[in-house]
Amino acid sequence: MAVLAALLSGCMSLSGERRTVSAPVATSGPDSTVFAEQTRLVATFGGEYAAPAPLIDLVREIVAKIVAASDDPAVRYRVTVLNSPSINAFALPTGDLYVTRGLLALANDTSELAAVLAHEVGHVTAKHASQRAEFERQATTAMPDSISGPNGAASRFLLASFSRGQELEADEVGIRTIAKAGYDPYGAARFLASLARQTTFVGEIRPSARYSFLSSHPSTPQRLAAALETARANVGATSIEADRARYLTALSGIAYGDDPFGGVVRGRRFLHARLDFMMLAPEGFVLENSPQAVIGVTGNGQEALRLDTVRLGGAGPEAALAGGWIDGATNSEITPFSINGLSGATATAKGPEWTFRLAAIQKGEDIFRIIFAAREMTPVLDRTFLASIGSFRTLTSDEKLGLRPQRLETVAAGGDDTAMTLLTKSDRADNALDRFLVLNGLDRPKIRAGELYKLILSE
């Protein structure tokens, strides 16, 4: 497994104004080990995101209110918005809080976002983040060097979940804090419900989707029931309606979905506007994009894919393959090929537990490295890998046009509007109604005149 982990967590890049939000509140001493990983962690999530100015101001206000109402108001918290469509938020013991633009897009009022941020503050004040950092240090010490890399620690951080008890404790602390700060204590339960809807929706269209907020912050019935009970004990907050209108107004214009600059996943296809290429993964693979690489896995975990790019100072595909990409694996004879006007080379490699189909394709100065791994390689499976490699090509004009960046815009519903009439103003997409309901926190397509709703538009 160490070899496969190295394959999936390596750090070569396929990758483009950034802003950090600070609450004006003295700082406890940072954990130097965790602090050293912050840059790598941010890079793993696509770097910092320059959110719309009204949203930045609102987040700053929310953080300041939460800190003032928290159990330790002397700690300074800094919130960084990450340029990732995934739904995630996490805290470091330094007081650094991270939230993805994907999570901001899912929230529907200031109380929901306050609940997420207060939950993470709860992890810090309860020392959960320090305990998780210690776990990470131990994992780093025990992990073979072959898995380590510039983004290795960040990847392991993502996999270190808080315990169920810690999650419930952070929920309770967070709900109590937002109520004290003047926010609706039921915001936490609403956001947990939205997370559950999102998980159901994503699970239907991408069954193996990973690394969401839910993977480390599960929205279990027990957790939702506990959140509702805690909220009932802390009633007395501001108007939900006012919170929703203000939040959605500030949110309008935020980027939505994959950043075309770093490539986008469309089912089994991966398309990259800047690098001008696409590739089709085999049937059964679910793709996940990151700034470092495209990763693909099958539902049973028996096959995997990695695609990244390097520049080797003029070396061609055969020379690139000759360098050896898999520790502990022996390459077969290298075979050159030509596909879609591009030159490439391929080989197989055999490791103790996995067999690999390797390919290098040259496009301009870039060498694209494609690695397929299988626990049990068969001739039929190898042919499907080769067919996928053969799908690598430059983009068509229509494909480039379809890769325009998307954003969320909020619109007020008219008296005659329905969910379907609102969707006529949005980009056409598969599962459009279901996505609309999830984004707007709705169980059913019932629209209220004058209320704001999120729509997805292309730039």
For each feature predicted by the language model, list its residue ranges.
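Surface-exposed amphipathic alpha-helical segments
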Residues: 114, 285, 370-410
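Primarily a LysM-type cell-wall glycan-binding module
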Residues: 397-430
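Extended non-catalytic domains of envelope/secretory-pathway proteins
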Residues: 284-286, 294-297, 322-336, 341, ...
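Extracellular LysM carbohydrate-binding repeats and other cell-envelope/extracellular binding modules
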Residues: 431-459
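Signature of long, low-cysteine stretches enriched in small and polar/charged residues
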Residues: 322-371
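A Zn2+-metalloprotease active-site environment signal
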Residues: 1, 11-252, 256-272, 278-280, ...
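Short, well-ordered beta-strand elements
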Residues: 306-309, 365-376
